[in-house]
Structures are given as C-alpha cells and as structure tokens.
Amino acid sequence: MSLPACRIVLLGLLAPTLGSAQSTPAPSPAADSGFAAMKARGAVVMGVGQDASEHGFDDLPDGGRIVYRMLDPADTAGATTIRRHLRSIGDSFAVGVFGGPAEVHGIEVPGTAEMARRRGGIRYAAHDVPSGAELRISSADSSAIAAIHAFLAFQRMDHRAAGHDRMHHP
C-alpha cells in the first residue's frame, strides 16, 4: 500500500474517535436512577441533600480531605448538620467503622477495608469552614494513603463531585 493510501486508511480508522475526548456521553437512565437512589440514601445518612450542598474530595500527599458545604450560606442549620456529620464520620472511621459510606453508596466503598485495617496509623481531624466543614485524613503509611486515595476517588466519581480546588465558591 502506498503512503498516501495508508494515510487515508489510517484517517478512516481514526475518524470515528476524533473528537471523542471532547464530548462526554450522557449518563444512561440506569446511571441516573442509581445516582438518584444514592442521593436519597445520602440525604438520610448525612442529614443534608446533595442538591443543597457541595462536596469536594481531594487527594493530598499524606492522605486527603473531604470538604462539605451548604450552597446557601444563610442555611446555618444545614451547616451545623454537616459539621456534626463530618465529626461523626471522623470518629467512626478512626475506630474502623465505615457503615455510613456503605449505606450511602449501597456497597463497600473502595479503600475502606484497608483504611479499617490500618486505622491505628490514620488521623482524622474535622474543622469548620464557611457553611460547612472539612475532614482531613492523614497518614505516614503509604498503604493507608493509597487506600485513602481510592476512597476519595470513588467518592468523587459516585457523588459526581470535583476536588475542592474546582468547587464553586458562593
């Protein structure tokens, strides 16, 4: 095959994929119903609906952080609920109990089994931020850090959330 003919064949093979990195297919109805179910379970477990709040899940070199805030800064009751929730999950995670995320997501969340096994080497520190709270998760144990990153990656994906750096700041 000549070089020009080879280019035409190659372009013909690549044409269907050109631009595919630019567009994201719409979620399937099943994915949307699964997302809706997760949001409904989350509203019960977390005490605040996902549509009224924003989540950020950041990987950091020594672990990560969860930032959870109300979209409406005037919703002080919601902010109080978030603060109580993040402190509660920090306390639960510290003793190896990850029932909250399992209940919200309907599965054992990736990373949590290893985080439970390595709980003695993981620190959890919650503090208030405007309209919500942040839970900082840190460790010096590389296996624990990998588990924390797996946990946070799943959270970003399932909540359709960005990292904190890309969150909308009201």
Give names to the regions the model predicted.
Residues 1-4:
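N-terminal secretory signal peptides that target proteins for export/translocation
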